[in-house]
Each structure stands twice: as structure tokens, then as C-alpha cells.
Swiss-Prot record:
Disulfide bond annotation, renumbered to this chain: none
Record EC number: 1.6.99.1
Listed name of the protein: NADPH dehydrogenase
Gene: namA
Family listed: Belongs to the NADH:flavin oxidoreductase/NADH oxidase family. NamA subfamily.
SUPFAM superfamilies referenced in this protein's UniProt entry, alphabetically: FMN-linked oxidoreductases (SSF51395)
Pfam families per the UniProt record, alphabetical: Oxidored_FMN
């Protein structure tokens, strides 16, 4: 059987062997608290490459120490991080997968001790600390930190960079009127609220000529927040700036009750793909081979991003291939167990 799921996908000169992407998921496993790659990362990510995932995106990696979600996150704010990341890249590529990294700043959702920063001095919830409103100097330093992170990612050998503009972290905080009450050129109108992300994309593109993805939260799930329709002009601008694919998630900029069900975010990816004319990745409770194939076959997205499913089963591509009646190449060491 010919499937879209197991067909190659090419973006900006990089060809993935299939359309299966490991979604960036924080492991909170840097026990040294210095942002460096640890043994866990060297086992966790290559295991999915052995499992035949096409593209593995490393978890949200802090572009500054205070930009981490927690002290146990990976970092890319210092040249000392390059060696460990380079080693991780080599291990993943050795087993046939492409590898990307998600550059991130947690903004007001950072749980690192010390001062936290955000577009406006609005806490995430009642139990969260109030962040410092960023000055223009803070903004300039943070844009520079994203560029420096991209430069280090290139030195480490990554194939793809994804900018984290979702889930209520710093860039998402600038985009949403729920968290951005600024009165300068970085707040107010939708165009102004996009300004920070626009500067980050331009800064990254100055030093990075490879595939560039952006993860977005296509709905704030709040009557006064952003909807998927609001994201269409944002994504069109991203495309003009050289973004190659938008990874479409949703929520988490403010506390909200979200009804989740199989493929609940796929319609967002489909809408963005159709209305903005850009390749998209679908993510969120995609669990079976047939479900993933339906999303791709019907043109609802170009790639499928799997999160928890790949935590449960590093060899999900094999299970999906068996389900769809597709024979895929097995690691030589596993051939006896992968025959069907």
C-alpha cells in the first residue's frame, strides 16, 4: 500500500524519510541545572531515531538562563552547550533521523528563581509571580539571544530550527491581547503585537539558512483572546519572512478548560494551511496510523507531530506501518522482530 505517512517530505533542501515528527516535549532532565545535555537525552532521542521517526525535534531549549521553564531544561545560551548538543545530533543522525531544536523563552511562565520578564506585568494566574514588564533594552537582548541560539544550533549541526511561539510562553505572550497590554510599538494592534516575533524571525534568518518552523497556539480558548482566524495574517507574514512550516498547537496563554478528543487540533492546522497557504504540522491526540494517514491524505496537514504516543512507544512508526500494511526498513539489529 502506498501511503502519504511513509512518503518523503522535502523542505528547503532537507528531505525527511517520512512524515512522522517527534514533537518537542520537555524532559526536565538536566540534573546539573546548567542547561547541558545529560545521559537521559542521549538515550531518549536516539531511541526514537532507531524507531524510524523521520524528524526529531529536541525539547524547548532556553535561549537565556531565565528563559527556561525550569532549572532542569536544556539551554543554548552559552557556547559551552554546543558540544553536548553536537554529540546528541550525531547520535540521532547515525540512526537515520533528521533532528531539529526548539528555541524558547518561557516569559512569565518561567519557574526559574529570580526575576522573570514578560511583555506586561501580568501574572499567568493567581499563584504565579508578577513578571517585570520588558524594556526595549530587554527586548533587544532577547531577540539577540534567539539569534545567538540559532547560531549555536547551526554549529551543533541541527537540520531544523523551530521557534516556540505557543503555549503561553514569551512570544505567545506578545501575540495575545490577554497577556500584552503594552502601549508602545510592541503592543496594541495585532501588527504591533506581532512585532517581537517578526524581529525574532528576522534575527534567526540572518544566521540560519535551513528549514525554519514556528509553533503557534491557534486558539486562546477565551472570548477576548486570539482565534485561528486571527492567526492567518500572522502566518502569512511568517511565510513572507522565510518560515517554511507552522506547527499548529493551541491554548495555554491563560488558564482555560479545553475539550480534548482525538485529533482536536487538526482543524486548526487544516485552516491555517488552506487560508495562509503554508505547510503545516498537525499535533494533538494523533495516535494511530490510520488517523495520521487520514490527516495527510486529505491535505489537512503536511506532517504529523506525535507527543505522548512516542513517549509510550518509541517504535510507533513500526506499529503504524504494520497497521497500514506498509513495509519499512528495520534496524538490522531488530529485523527478526519487525517482520510481519
Amino acid at each position: 500500500m502506498n501511503t502519504v505517512l511513509f512518503s518523503p517530505y522535502t523542505t528547503r533542501g532537507l528531505t525527511l524519510k517520512n512524515r512522522i515528527v517527534m514533537s518537542p516535549m520537555c524532559m526536565y532532565s538536566c540534573d546539573t541545572k546548567d542547561g547541558t545535555v545529560r545521559t537521559w537525552h542521549k538515550i531518549h532521542y536516539p531511541a526514537r531515531a532507531i524507531g524510524q521517526v523521520g524528524l526529531i525535534i529536541v525539547e524547548a531549549t532556553g535561549v537565556t538562563p531565565q528563559g527556561r521553564i525550569s532549572e532542569h531544561d536544556l539551554g543554548i545560551w552559552d557556547d559551552d552547550h554546543i558540544h553536548g548538543l553536537h554529540e546528541l545530533v550525531g547520535l540521532v543522525k547515525e540512526h537515520g533521523a533528521a533532528i531539529g531544536i526548539q528555541l524558547a523563552h518561557a516569559g512569565r511562565k518561567s519557574e526559574v528563581p529570580g526575576e522573570i520578564i514578560a511583555p506586561s506585568a501580568i501574572p499567568f494566574n493567581e499563584s504565579s509571580p508578577t513578571p517585570k514588564e520588558m524594556t526595549k533594552a530587554d527586548i533587544e537582548k532577547t531577540v539577540q539571544a534567539f539569534q545567538d541560539g540559532a547560531r549555536r544550533a547551526k554549529k551543533a549541526g541541527f537540520d531544523v530550527i523551530e521557534i516556540h511561539a505557543a503555549h503561553g510562553y514569551l512570544i505567545n505572550e506578545f501575540l495575545s491581547p490577554l497577556s500584552n497590554r503594552r502601549q508602545d510599538e510592541y503592543g496594541g494592534s495585532p501588527e504591533n503585537r506581532y512585532h517581537f516575533l517578526g524581529e525574532v524571525i528576522d534575527a534567526v534568518r540572518e544566521v540560519w539558512d535551513g528549514p525554519l518552523f514556528v509553533r503557534i497556539s491557534a486558539s486562546d480558548y477565551h472570548p477576548d483572546g486570539l482565534t485561528v482566524k486571527d492567526y492567518v495574517p500572522y502566518v502569512k507574514r511568517m511565510k513572507e519572512q522565510g518560515v517554511d512550516l507552522v506547527d499548529v498547537s493551541s491554548g495555554a496563554v491563560v488558564p482555560a478548560r479545553i475539550d480534548v478528543y482525538p485529533g482536536y487540533q487538526v482543524p486548526f492546522a487544516e485552516f491555517i494551511r488552506r487560508e495562509a497557504g503554508i505547510p503545516t504540522g498537525a499535533v494533538g491526540l494523533i495516535t494511530s496510523g490510520w488517523q495520521a494517514e487520514e490527516v495527510l491524505h486529505n491535505g489537512r496537514a503536511d506532517l504529523v507531530f506525535l507527543g505522548r504516543e512516542l513517549l509510550r512507544n518509541p517504535y510507533w512508526p513500526y506499529a503504524a506501518a504494520k497497521e497500514l500494511g506498509v513495509k519499512i526498513e528495520a534496524p538490522v539489529q531488530y529485523e527478526r522482530g519487525w517482520r510481519f
